[in-house]
Every structure is written in C-alpha cells, then in structure tokens.
C-alpha cells in the first residue's frame, strides 16, 4: 500500500510539472503570441471583446502612440530576455503568488511592492464591485488583506494556462535603486513600521552593529542605509530566507522571461500607463488613485541620489550587479549619481 501511494504521489508531481512546463513555454512577445492564443475565446468574461483583443486591435493601428510605446517595451523585454536570461528551474505554483486575477475583466496583474501596488489592488477591488466602485474608499489595510484578491497560484495548472492564454497580463516596474530607496525609507526609516522593523531592522542591527545598544538591537528602528545595503549583499541573507518582497528584484517576483506580459507599465509614467490598462479593461471611467501629495520623478530620484551619496563605489558596484537584471530587462540606465568601478 505504501509503495502504491508513493507511486501515485510521484505521478501526480510529474503531471503537475508537465502542466507547468507548458506555462513556462508561454511566448513573451505579444505579436507572435496572438497566432497561438485564444484572443478571448476562452475568456471567462463573456461575449464582449476582451482586453487582449482590444490590445491586438490597437497594436495593428499605427496611429496609436501609446500602443506603440508598449509594443516597444515588450520587444525590448523579449530581446533582453533572449540575451541575458539563463536556463532556470521549472516554475512552481508558489512562484505565481504575486500574479493577481480579475476574471470579470480578463486581467492578470503581477504586483511589485513600491510600484503603486496598493493603488492597483484598490483598483482591482473596485472593479470587483467593492467599495461601490471607488478605489479611494478602500484603505491600504483592506487592499493588502490576504484573500481579498485571488492569485494565479490558487488555480490548477489547467486553469492557470487557460488564463495565461486568454487574459491581458501586465506589471508595473520602477527604476530599481529608486524603488530600493523608497523601500528603505518607508519600511526601515519611518516610525509607523515598528513591526516590520522588529523583524528585519533588529536582524540587521544585530548582525552588522556588534556594539549596538540593547534598545536598537530589540527594536531595529534606526537602521542606516549603509547597513541595509550590507545586509542585502551578505550571502547569509538569502541563504536564510528569500528576500522580502519590498526589496526582491522585480524579475524574481514576476518572472517576465518565463511568463508573457502584454503591458509593461512604469512608475515614471504611471498615470498614462494606468489609464491605458483601464481603457483596455473597459473601465476608462475609473480614476486611478494618485499619491496623497504631488511627488514627481525628480523627488524619487533625489531621494535615491542622497542615500547613495555616502556609499562607496565598491558597494555601489556590488549592489548594481545584484539588481542588474531589472536594469537590463526593463530598459533602465545606471543612475548618473553612481560611481561605478
């Protein structure tokens, strides 16, 4: 009986692996992919044109400036993946945990923390009819509550592949070091993140500041930016557990070289790109929530430049190498404030 159960488990694992292998083979580039994709025929939203069909129509229209921008981003991503990605392990369902599903509108959204993901979760909840369709009425706590939005990892391999074929998949990215600076400021340098600081800040202080005061070792409330970077670069960090999602690389969260993304939005052009996605979803009347106060790209860049100013060129280079794939895949140049060796 024991051997028979073991064989069944091995067979089930093999079937799951084979199904996910199909998932990994999904084409990255939009235009070649249309010939092999259902274009909404298996979409769960009904007879109206799916967001993927609308994007296909725009892709054929030379007058659509935004469609051209997103086509270029897809092509650049596809080219960078071909040049720089290595053979990787098979994707497991848990790898799809960051891909959220909106069956009613035919959307797959891979969220990257510190790239407007709270507001995108608000929007998806509003699209589902919660808070009477007003994303601004949804608190950040509600938006991040577990189970409020289904993840692609919650479905069977067959259901995963069906959605990958028929739905519009999108993600939003940000200049990697500006995202890192934002994560440090909001999670380790602000007083309202006490629980996060006790978990990660205390660990950083205990490892990197041997003579720290007991209060700092317990609370982790005064982590310096240089200590945070040293923690990221320490090989022990990733041996102990995966990076926290707030500083994990975007490509490691969303696997853009193995999953096909139709729209690559950018934090730097957030308003335009968000409106483009909402238009494809048939929700142009829904306003994407803006930040509580005006923050331009210059403010984000200035914060990163100020924090990196006192970091040595040696550590700047090591950190750039750690996040290099995000720079390459999403077409970001090395920041001008870096002094790379």
UniProtKB/Swiss-Prot annotation:
GO molecular function: chondroitin 4-sulfotransferase activity; dermatan 4-sulfotransferase activity; sulfotransferase activity
UniProt enzyme class: transferase
InterPro entries: Carb_sulfotrans_8-10, Sulfotransferase
Alphabetic keyword roster: Carbohydrate metabolism, Glycoprotein, Golgi apparatus, Membrane, Phosphoprotein, Signal-anchor, Transferase, Transmembrane, Transmembrane helix
Membrane topology: Single-pass type II membrane protein
GO process terms (BP): carbohydrate biosynthetic process; chondroitin sulfate proteoglycan biosynthetic process; proteoglycan biosynthetic process
Tissue: Highly expressed in adult liver. Expressed at lower level in kidney, lymph nodes and fetal kidney.
Catalytic activity as recorded in UniProt: chondroitin beta-D-glucuronate + n 3'-phosphoadenylyl sulfate = chondroitin 4'-sulfate + n adenosine 3',5'-bisphosphate + n H(+)
Residues on Lumenal side: 31-341
Residue stretches spanning the membrane: 10-30
Modified residues (Phosphoserine): 139
Record motif Cell attachment site, residues: 132-134
Role noted for this protein: Catalyzes the transfer of sulfate to position 4 of the N-acetylgalactosamine (GalNAc) residue of chondroitin. Chondroitin sulfate constitutes the predominant proteoglycan present in cartilage and is distributed on the surfaces of many cells and extracellular matrices. No activity toward dermatan.
Family from the record: Belongs to the sulfotransferase 2 family.
PANTHER family reported in the protein's UniProt record: CARBOHYDRATE SULFOTRANSFERASE, CARBOHYDRATE SULFOTRANSFERASE 13
Name of the protein in its database record: Carbohydrate sulfotransferase 13
Organism field: Homo sapiens (Human)
